[in-house]
Curated annotation (Swiss-Prot):
The protein's name: Probable nicotinate-nucleotide adenylyltransferase
Gene3D superfamilies for this protein: HUPs (3.40.50.620)
Keyword hit for ATP-binding: yes
Signal peptide span: none
UniProt xrefs under InterPro entries: Cyt_trans-like, NadD/NMNAT, Rossmann-like_a/b/a_fold
GO MF annotation list: ATP binding; nicotinate-nucleotide adenylyltransferase activity
PANTHER family recorded: NICOTINATE-NUCLEOTIDE ADENYLYLTRANSFERASE-RELATED, PHOSPHOPANTETHEINE ADENYLYLTRANSFERASE
GO BP annotations, alphabetical order: NAD biosynthetic process
Keyword Methyltransferase belongs to the record: no
Gene encoding the protein: nadD
Enzyme Commission number(s) of this protein: 2.7.7.18
Catalysed reactions listed for this entry: nicotinate beta-D-ribonucleotide + ATP + H(+) = deamido-NAD(+) + diphosphate
A Pfam family recorded for this sequence: CTP_transf_like
CDD domains in alphabetical order: NMNAT
Amino acid sequence: MRKIGIIGGTFDPPHYGHLLIANEVYHALNLEEVWFLPNQIPPHKQGRNITSVESRLHMLELATEAEEHFSICLEELSRKGPSYTYDTMLQLTKKYPDVQFHFIIGGDMVEYLPKWYNIEALLNLVTFVGVARPGYTLHTPYKITTVEIPEFAVSSSLLRERYKEKKTCKYLLPEKVQVYIERNGLYES
């Protein structure tokens, strides 16, 4: 059985924190690959202004292109409406019956697990992998695998705010992503 990691998110923008998490879990769990799963509309972010799918996907391609064990999974982008992890993983487990999926989440999402749509059924489809995030614990009533990673306190919301305030984002996200953001005037207001 193949072992594949999945890291979902809006990736608005993708940054070194995402890449660090994916790489650390890849090595810690001896995975074959890590798939980045960009969301169409995450249920917990409905109503928020999100950068276009095309821009987010292009930035994710730029961020992951140098790593042969990173891929992008377009499963959620092909659907309209909110992206529920249960629906996505049900599709993926049917499509790839020979894969054991390890769904990677940060400490913020570990705490939120009891509120996830159809969580009990989802636990039968994937192994959750929790990684620590500053300010959050990994306590949950559900069985999860935990992976310790070096602390790197960066988030997409922090980067959007820094761009809005015209602060430097160098060394926080891949240079090609930074160039794309600046050329396209993303996050300026």
